[in-house]
Regions:
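N-terminal targeting/trafficking signals and adjacent low-complexity tails
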Residues: 1-21, 105-116
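Hydrophobic (often cysteine-bearing) scaffold residues that line and stabilize catalytic clefts
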Residues: 10, 81-82
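Auxiliary, metal-adjacent structural segments of Zn-dependent hydrolase domains
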Residues: 12-58
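Short coil/turn segments at beta-strand junctions that form active-site/ligand-binding loops
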Residues: 29, 80-81
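Functionally constrained cores in energy, signaling, and assembly domains
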Residues: 35, 70, 84
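Active-site scaffold of zinc-dependent metalloenzymes
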Residues: 46-77, 92-106, 111
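Active-site recognition of the HExxH zinc-binding catalytic motif
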Residues: 83-95
Length: 116
């Protein structure tokens, strides 16, 4: 069974990245960060509180969970880690609806260049 542990240090990095790139629409009180270890190629993934879940649980505000596969994430450079964090943050739409934004790789590259 996969075990998840909170990753407050990754949340702090994400807050810094968002601050530098003017991603002010992200409410970090409703974005949660976790590490896990698993034998997959995935480095990170984001999960939202989709509209159908919001209908079932109307008393819960939309939120996001970003998980990092420590086995893969820790192997890459800090710059690549920051790009991965940024990539996941860019999936959060300006409406903070619990859904995802589709992002073009050119947008990720442009924002990455702004961050560096």
């Amino acid at each position: 069974m996969v075990e998840y542990t909170e990753a407050p240090e990754l949340k702090e990095r994400a807050i810094k990245i968002a601050g530098k790139l003017n991603l002010a629409h992200i409410d970090f009180d409703r974005v949660h960060f976790y590490r896990y270890t698993c034998d997959t190629r995935t480095c990170a993934k984001i999960t939202g509180f989709f509209k159908t879940l919001q209908l079932a649980y109307p008393h819960i505000n939309p939120f996001y969970v970003i998980t990092f596969n420590d086995k893969n994430f820790s192997r890459v450079s800090e710059q690549e880690q920051n790009q991965t964090i940024l990539h996941e943050l860019l999936h959060i739409p300006k409406t903070f609806s619990g859904e995802f934004s589709k992002i073009a790789h050119s947008k990720i590259y442009k924002k990455s260049r702004e961050f560096i």
